[in-house]
Amino acid sequence: MMEWRDEGALLSVRRHGESSAIIEVFTAAHGRHAGVVRGGASRKIAPILQPGAQLDLTWKARLDEHMGAFTVEPLRSRTALLGDRLGLAGLNAICAMLHVTLPEREPHSTLWQESMALLDALDRPGWPPAYLRWEMRLLEETGFGLDLTRCAVTGSREDLAFVSPKTGRAVSRGAAGGWADRLFPLPLALLGQGPASAEEVRQGLAITGHFLGRELAPLLNGRPLPEARARLMELLARA
């Protein structure tokens, strides 16, 4: 019998049979993991199984490769976000992006810590810049990090103004020349310089979205990034 105990955030839930549910969670030590919750559709347990909820999880299976079953205890509910359109959109985007990005059962401890901190921040104003930084981390977890430290053409660290949509590397204003309209504008928010305006966050997310879509293309099978992320982008565009 295989067994472990861990803490995780619920990414998705679907009904299974008459009274059970299959949940997917992102855990601290076991990564993205699915399992059955017996009685998960019951009046007692169903209210606990809400996306974003932080859970104390015990997983058991006869063999490691089996889906197995979870027992769950609530640690933190995030149902307060149900009354906050932008916060709820952020939560749904985080859960959806973790689902499509992470391989099953592969630990990502640093990303887990940063994801929990971001989920905790959603009920406070001013979190979109943190979401942008989180998507940059998510991109790094795919094995493709942006290189914004120096110009890809000249090697200079000064006046970095653009990002190449091919390489993800920064380009200085002078080196861009007539190619500037084919490059992404580089917001200072991605360089960690100064407070991030709403426009800079949108520009930054256009960059991370471009590269996440490209790197995840084999997993998406021609589909775009999750609709939950697109919904968040729509709301941020109106902000």
Swiss-Prot record:
Physiological role = Involved in DNA repair and RecF pathway recombination.
Q: Does the keyword DNA damage apply?
A: yes
Return the similarity comment.
Belongs to the RecO family.
What name appears for this protein in its UniProt entry? Answer: DNA repair protein RecO
Note the Gene3D superfamilies from the entry.
Nucleic acid-binding proteins, Recombination protein O, C-terminal domain
- Name its species: Cereibacter sphaeroides (strain ATCC 17029 / ATH 2.4.9) (Rhodobacter sphaeroides)
PANTHER family for this protein: DNA REPAIR PROTEIN RECO
Question: What are the record's GO terms for cellular component?
Answer: bacterial nucleoid
Protein's gene:
recO
Q: Which GO terms describe its biological process?
A: DNA recombination; double-strand break repair
Q: Which UniProt keywords apply?
A: DNA damage, DNA recombination, DNA repair
Q: Which residues form a coiled coil?
A: none
